[in-house]
């Protein structure tokens, strides 16, 4: 029997740390973590998230270890709606990253909270 994408994401989230954008941005101020946007570059053109590091979901496993070399460094993942970020976070944990959080809201909300934090 097949599993739907919604079920796959829900099952993955059960084992992941998930936060809303406001909580994640406040926590980032304390942890010095890195926000990773797993959307494709074309998506960034129409809806940028300027304080995020873009590593598209399709190449995440191939690139992340060159960029984030500390397995315990706080990582906060987001995408357009939270689905790809959830699946990406699951993969990062499989790679050995121990401090991975999914921001589970639309990218527009993430951007709004990034802008709010930057203006403080």
Predicted feature descriptions by range:
Residues 1-34, 41-74, 80-120:
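Rhodanese-like catalytic fold shared by cysteine-dependent sulfurtransferases
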């Amino acid at each position: 029997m097949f599993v739907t994408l919604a079920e796959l994401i829900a099952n993955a989230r059960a084992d992941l740390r998930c936060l809303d954008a406001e909580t994640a941005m406040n926590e980032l101020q304390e942890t010095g973590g890195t926000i990773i946007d797993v959307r494709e570059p074309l998506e960034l053109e129409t809806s940028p998230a300027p304080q995020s590091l873009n590593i598209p979901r399709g190449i995440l496993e191939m690139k992340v270890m060159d960029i984030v070399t500390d397995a315990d460094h706080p990582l906060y993942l987001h995408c357009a709606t939270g689905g790809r970020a959830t699946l990406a976070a699951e993969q990062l944990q499989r790679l050995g990253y121990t401090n991975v959080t999914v921001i589970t809201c639309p990218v527009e909300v993430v951007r709004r909270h990034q802008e709010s934090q930057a203006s403080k």
